[in-house]
Amino acid sequence: MVNNFRIYKNFNLSKKDKEAIILIGNFDGLHRGHQKLFNKAKSFKKKFKLRIGVITFDPIPKMFFKKLHNYRLSNFDQKIQLFKKNYVDFIVNQKFDIKFSKISCFDFIKKILFNKIKPKYIFVSDNFRFGYKRAGDIKLLKSLEKDYGYKIINPSPLKSKRFVISSTLIRKNLEMGNLKKVKKFSVSYTHLRAHETQRY
């Protein structure tokens, strides 16, 4: 558990939170795929003596574009507790709106990641997309590593049989009432059950 955990609402970080290990994603309903990512980040934290930060978005971009309700698996307070348990030092909870959605993938890398965050390592999953019209991906991030001084870390996805463990997979199983599978995939099963009850 981390002491002095900090929550930012924009990318203006304090000096001590720059040049950190950065994880980018929604991290909705912490599952075992997320846990694999956090475990890897924790090993980097110990090895390189760096802080861990998470960049996440509110609302989840898919909720914003498709005007979805009752989509989240975790509320904000639940996310914070799960981050703290995984030795995250700070988060950037960026408001996702029309203005932010118009930022190009190149501007996101240069003006936000490079100019403001200055990460040493960026942890992302295979399906990560960013920038206007989701034009940016992990391939683009990797191609600009040397230009902007970061290193992309992309752990292989965790699978259950042929399925990648993801928030989408958990949602589908919740909708079908497959609670045994939800419990198997999820790190935050208690949170999910409590939150699911509140949704209906």
Show the residue positions of the predicted features.
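N-terminal catalytic cores of NTP/NDP-binding nucleotidyl/phosphoryl-transfer enzymes
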Residues: F11-N75
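A short, charged helix-loop
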Residues: D147-L158
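Short acidic-hydrophobic, aromatic-tinged amphipathic segments that line or gate anion-handling sites
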Residues: N4-F11
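N-terminal Rossmann-like or analogous alpha/beta NTP/dinucleotide-binding catalytic cores
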Residues: M63-D126, F130-Y148
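Extended, well-folded interaction surfaces typified by the phenylalanyl-tRNA synthetase beta subunit core
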Residues: I165-I170
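Conserved small/polar residues in nucleotide/adenosyl-binding loops
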Residues: T190-T197
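Divalent metal-coordination and catalytic microenvironments
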Residues: H31, I122, V182
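Short helix-adjacent coil turns
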Residues: L174-K181
